[in-house]
Design a protein with these regions (language model features):
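Metal-dependent phosphodiesterase/nuclease catalytic metal-binding core
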Residues: 2, 121-175
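Conserved beta-strand hairpin/beta-sheet module of binuclear metal-dependent hydrolase folds
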Residues: 2-52, 88, 148-150, 156-157
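Generic structural signal for residues in well-ordered beta-strands
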Residues: 7, 116-118, 134
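Short glycine/serine/proline-enriched coil/turn segments at secondary-structure junctions
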Residues: 16-18, 110, 141-143
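Active-site metal-binding motif and surrounding structural segment of the metallo-beta-lactamase
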Residues: 41-92, 120
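Alpha-helix N-cap/helix-start and coil->helix boundary motif
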Residues: 44, 54, 67, 97-98, ...
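Structured loop/turn residues at beta-strand edges in well-structured enzyme cores
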Residues: 52-55, 114, 130-132
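Active-site neighborhood of divalent metal-dependent phosphoester bond hydrolases
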Residues: 85-120
Length: 175
């Protein structure tokens, strides 16, 4: 399994989608897993247009509960279900996330075939996802909101001193 980390912007638009831009959604591919940060309307369609599979999402982090940051979640979860997902899904957000996801999962008539766990985060709470940790940071907005700091854990690798010199990295004690 690859340890590569890749970020894919699925939506960067404002409060509502436009013909050329989707609303907030960013996928972070870490090895074979995908973390989703916000899930605005149309996120599942943006996944289909990208090279990233929404079936590989292991965790979703919602920054706040304005529609342009979470209204894509019900459709995404139902599409995962219809596509045969069995792997668990973790969803994190600010206080109120448990009630919101419970209400979301009651929409429509379908039986969820995979487990969904929900966690509410406060400032400085940390979620350990194996290769990375995600730390919540309280944001300033008109509603309670979080930003997220993603940190990759140290891993063994190969250092190429000649390439470092070419890039202008000054020699030092860890060179």
């Amino acid at each position: 399994m690859s340890n590569d980390v890749r970020m894919v912007f699925l939506g960067t638009g404002g409060g509502m989608p436009s013909p050329s831009r989707g609303v907030s959604a960013t996928a972070l591919q870490v090895g074979g897993d995908v973390l989703l940060f916000d899930c605005g309307e149309g996120t599942q369609r943006q996944f289909m247009r990208s090279s990233v599979s929404f079936m590989k999402i292991t965790a979703v982090f919602i920054s706040h509960f304005h529609g342009d940051h979470f209204l894509g979640l019900p459709g995404l979860v139902q599409s995962m279900n219809f596509s045969g997902r069995s792997a668990p899904l973790e969803i994190y957000g600010p206080r109120g996330a448990i009630d919101l996801v419970k209400a979301m999962l009651s929409l429509g008539h379908f039986s969820l075939a995979f487990p969904v766990t929900v966690g509410e985060m406060d400032d400085e709470d940390v979620v350990d996802l194996g290769q990375v940790t995600v730390t919540a940071v309280a944001g300033e907005h008109s509603v309670p909101s979080l930003s997220f700091v993603i940190e990759e854990k140290a891993r063994r690798g190969r250092f190429h001193p000649e390439r470092a010199r070419e890039l202008g990295v000054p020699p030092g004690p860890m060179f």
